[in-house]
Amino acid sequence: MIVIMDNGGQYVHRIWRTLRYLGVEAKIIPNTTPLEEIKAMKPKGIIFSGGPDINKTGNCSAILEHYDEFNVPILGICLGHQLIAKHFGGKVGRGEKAEYSLVEIEILDENDIFRGLPRKLRVWESHMDEVKELPPGFKLLARSETCPVEAMKHESLPIYGVQFHPEVAHTEHGADIYRNFAELCGEL
């Protein structure tokens, strides 16, 4: 099962629906769910959803602080991506302009979550803030003309972040990104 931490984003149910469409068991839980309850669920992966406020991400940071107790792949979407970057020492701030549109990203490293996908994708973005500077120990996976860190991966742990929303229908190959993540979790 993959646990989806609900950070109040407008697309959280689309994440769940995409995973279910792929045949993956998934469960949306409040981001305030205690760590012990999350551990008892024995998730094989965790997704941090998007949301409106980086200061209202509940126990997502605690999961990162206690990563060795979970030891499963983590994928941060939009706000979740920013939270991961901030937690590991990256810089998050306002973008040059708010993005509520399709953006073309360039995949620099096919890596795990982009395995088998084209080098350029049109993706849906819905954000004011963005990762301005990659955290130490992370590798840049994708960028765009408007955002320097569209996707990243921890160099030694299976922790990923994407600024865009793979779950939105406008994103090309969005379901494939979730399929690749589910495969990393051993769910497919």
Curated annotation (Swiss-Prot):
Its biological purpose: Catalyzes the synthesis of GMP from XMP.
Which keywords does this chain's UniProt record carry?
A: ATP-binding, Glutamine amidotransferase, GMP biosynthesis, Ligase, Nucleotide-binding, Purine biosynthesis
What is this protein's record name?
GMP synthase [glutamine-hydrolyzing] subunit A
Q: CDD domains attached here?
A: GATase1_GMP_Synthase
User: HAMAP family attached here?
Assistant: GMP_synthase_A
E.C. number(s) listed in UniProt: 6.3.5.2
Outline the extent of the Glutamine amidotransferase type-1 domain: 1-188
Which top EC class is named for this enzyme in its record? ligase
The reaction(s) this protein catalyses = XMP + L-glutamine + ATP + H2O = GMP + L-glutamate + AMP + diphosphate + 2 H(+)
List the pathway annotation: Purine metabolism; GMP biosynthesis; GMP from XMP (L-Gln route): step 1/1
Catalytic residues as annotated in Swiss-Prot or TrEMBL: 78 (nucleophile), 165, 167
Q: Which Pfam families match?
A: GATase
List the transmembrane segments: none
Q: Molecular function terms in GO for this entry? A: ATP binding; GMP synthase (glutamine-hydrolyzing) activity
* Oligomer status and interactors: Heterodimer composed of a glutamine amidotransferase subunit (A) and a GMP-binding subunit (B).
